[in-house]
Regions:
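C-terminal catalytic/substrate-binding lobe primarily of soluble NAD(P)-dependent oxidoreductases
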Residues: 136-382
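Hydrophobic/small residue at the entry helix of a nucleotide-binding pocket
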Residues: 11-13
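N-terminal Rossmann-like NAD(P) cofactor-binding module of classical short-chain dehydrogenase/reductase
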Residues: 66-71, 92-93
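Rossmann-fold NAD(P)-binding glycine/threonine-rich loop
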Residues: 95-115
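Conserved N-terminal Rossmann-fold NAD(P)-binding element of oxidoreductases
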Residues: 4-9
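ADP-ribose/adenylate-binding Rossmann-like module
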Residues: 83-101
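Rossmann-fold cofactor-recognition segment
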Residues: 45-57
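NAD(P)-binding Rossmann-fold cofactor-contacting core
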Residues: 27-40
Length: 382
């Protein structure tokens, strides 16, 4: 039996680890701190072991036919994937595909090995929802590339109860702060829309959720353009809006105004040091309290117009909450990762470097819904 090497047992990993062990897979859980790996597997029985992680120890253990899941910091992924290719092992990660990862595609195909990335929440479930909506639209009577097309996808990790700061951290805030310094590129009114500072592009965004109507704030992040082709928005389509972005509670931009001002001034090593200091301060003041539950909202919208009239308008919505056992974020990041692991082991995903697979999207979303996630498709024209 192929052995699964799960690298990293941080906060977002535990449900996926436990699911694979409970389903009878052979698993080695690697973590720099062995105690964390032991906590992640506490109370389980099966063919699993925990080990102290180092690249050297992992390399010595990895065998041809095995599979490695990298839930390590992003700068490890390519090294782990390259080691897998040289050993004859497959690879799964929830992170975005870096250019260096994409460059491994030819080598992976040559060796008949599969490297799957972007199979967490965002990126991951958002891709799957987009694929399902696009399949539905293409199969409809109203489909035509000449229609005006509009697409938006927003995801946010929130606290169950809104606080004055309009945000609570379930792990170190440094990543959130660094993201505020990242420019974005999207499509608006059929034109390229570049934003250097996220807070300059904040918009209200109202959703009709199971618990009622709620207005959030959203803004674009990263470069949305590579995902147009991935989702099927080809050059012959009349696409007016295409944006992937971040969702926050209403009032977030006001509550964070002072942080925006400071982040904008930070430069060089001193700026990086101040960012770490600011992160630690925010963690002290706004961490998710013990016993407090988190929340994840994900909304993917696709609509089309002909002669100025809407002819298709559907959304794939999810409003999920953590419980006493796991955070919603951990469930929704690591459970799809475990789906991808099983699909690779069954040979269901071809060789090469891939994001969340199109073919499995509907099935995996149905399985997540069956696990109790509040999610589904809304037809706004019905």
């Amino acid at each position: 039996m192929a052995r699964i090497h799960w690298l990293g047992s941080g906060l977002s990993t535990v449900p996926g680890i436990r699911r694979l062990i409970e389903r009878g897979h052979s698993v080695t859980v690697w973590n720099r701190t062995v105690e964390k790996a032991e906590a992640a597997t506490a109370g389980l029985s099966g063919d699993f072991e925990v080990k102290a992680f180092s690249m050297e120890a992992f390399e010595a253990d990895l065998q041809a036919g095995d599979l490695a899941v990298s839930m390590l910091p992003g700068d490890f992924h390519v090294a782990v994937a390259d080691l897998c290719l040289n050993t004859g092992a497959n690879f799964v990660s929830s992170s975005y595909i870096a250019p260096e990862m994409k460059a491994l595609d030819a080598k992976a195909k040559e060796k008949g090995l599969t490297l799957v990335n972007e199979v967490g929440l965002d990126p991951g479930m958002d891709h799957m929802m987009a694929h399902v909506l696009m399949d539905d639209y293409r199969a409809s009577d109203v489909f035509s590339p000449d229609n005006e097309h509009y697409f938006r996808s927003y995801c946010g990790g929130l606290s169950e109860v809104k606080n004055e700061f309009c945000y609570k951290f379930s792990w170190a805030p440094l990543g959130v702060l660094k993201a505020l310094r990242s420019p974005s590129k999207s499509l608006r009114d059929g034109e390229v829309y570049n934003v250097s500072r996220p807070w300059d592009a904040v918009q209200d965004y109202t959703l009709d959720l199971p618990k009622g109507r709620e207005t959030f704030e959203v803004y674009p992040n990263r470069d949305s353009f590579p995902f147009m082709e991935e989702y099927g928005f080809t050059e012959d389509w009349n696409t007016q809006l295409f944006v992937r972005g971040t969702l926050r509670f209403g009032g977030w931009s006001t509550a964070w105004a002072d942080i925006f001002k400071e982040v904008e001034t930070l430069e060089g090593p001193e700026g990086e040091a101040r960012l770490v200091e600011l992160s630690e301060d925010l963690w002290q003041k706004n961490a998710l309290d013990e016993g407090e539950h988190d929340r994840v909202v994900l909304s993917v919208d696709l609509w089309a117009k002909k002669d100025g009239k809407e002819i298709y308008n559907k959304s794939y919505l999810m409003d999920a909450y953590g419980d006493d056992e796991h955070t919603a974020m951990a469930r929704l990041v690591s459970t799809p990762v475990s789906f991808a692991v099983e699909a690779v082991l069954k040979g269901e995903i071809p060789a090469g470097v891939h994001a969340a697979p199109h073919a499995q999207s509907e099935q995996w979303l149905a399985e997540l819904k069956a696990m109790g996630q509040d999610m589904g498709i809304v037809d706004h024209l019905a």
